[in-house]
């Protein structure tokens, strides 16, 4: 899959739960312009590699309640962040068993704007711009 993405100049979205260090090393072997670590669950130790390689990371509703993820987000530049919901999943931690869907995106962006000390409007524009760059990089 990575070889095909490299040859076709396609972006890739990678779910690397519990294997992030290994996956980063594998991805670095390819010349793929846009890599997204979807549902990023890495820590501060992984962030340097993410930043050095201009990889994107995305965060979902876990950003609303996970202190570890909030701490991690503080170290990632806004220009490398995307948001998502990856549903349907049940988030009993903060939404009383509501299934995730795009209606949660404004809450995620609001939380991100609070963490980054930026206006909601600025963060929305940046997330939109990041998304366009990620998807259209090869065009």
Task: Walk through the language-model features, giving the residues of each.
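Active-site glycine- and acidic-residue-rich loops that bind
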Residues: 56-70
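Mid-to-C-terminal alpha-helical segments outside catalytic/metal-binding sites
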Residues: 4, 103-139
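Divalent metal-binding pocket/active-site signature
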Residues: 1-53, 71, 96, 100, ...
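Hydrophobic alpha-helical segments typical of transmembrane helices
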Residues: 46, 68-69, 108, 127
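Short amphipathic alpha-helices and their capping/turn segments at secondary-structure boundaries
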Residues: 68-78
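Short acidic/histidine-rich active-site segments
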Residues: 79-98
